[in-house]
Amino acid sequence: MIAREGGPDACVKPYTPANDVTGPYTGTGNENVWGKRLASMLEKIMQAEFDVISQEYNRAAQLEYPGGVNTWSFEGADQFWMGLRASFPNAIFKVRHAIGRDDPAMPPRAAVRWTLSGRHEGYGAFGEPTGAEVFVLGATHAEYGELISGAPKLRREWTLYDETAVWKQILLHKEI
């Protein structure tokens, strides 16, 4: 892709804070408990508190991750989040926007937009460390449901980020 776009100097640069344009919306979400709960859970995961997965996820949670990955349960969540964090062990994770919804006849829902910014310093989902400065813009949506015990747990999760943009940042670093 980089070569097809004219090489490292001419190619389309991936989105980073350096080329960001401030839009008209600057809100950070709402005060709903479900958005706060999802944001808190993601912050804990990114602080390597992976035990939160077994506490917050339903054992049969359906999980959709980048690359067309469809997986289930604690193991699937562990594998995805640990792989991402392992690639960028010292990167700074920030919640940028969190919203939750409680509506009649609907399950509780939440959406979080987040960023991960730092160097590719670890072995994980993005292979051998390169030292590349990487910026990941991600979004996680979740649906919660009650168990027999009545304690609501995360039962569906959809997390997205642009894998191609992450790889492009890594490859551009290698070509410099």
Question: Whereabouts are the PLM-identified features?
Answer:
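Short, solvent-exposed secondary-structure boundary motifs
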Residues: 86, 130-134
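Residue-level preference for long, well-ordered alpha-helices that form the structural scaffold
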Residues: 30, 34, 73, 131-132
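Short beta-strand edge/turn micro-motifs at domain boundaries
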Residues: 1-12, 107, 111, 133-175
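Alpha-helical packing segments of well-folded alpha/beta enzyme cores
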Residues: 37, 41, 80, 138-140
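Alpha-helical membrane-targeting segments
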Residues: 30, 175-176
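Short, surface-exposed loop/helix-turn segments at secondary-structure junctions
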Residues: 122-131
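Short, low-complexity N-terminal intrinsically disordered segments enriched in polar/charged residues
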Residues: 2-55, 59
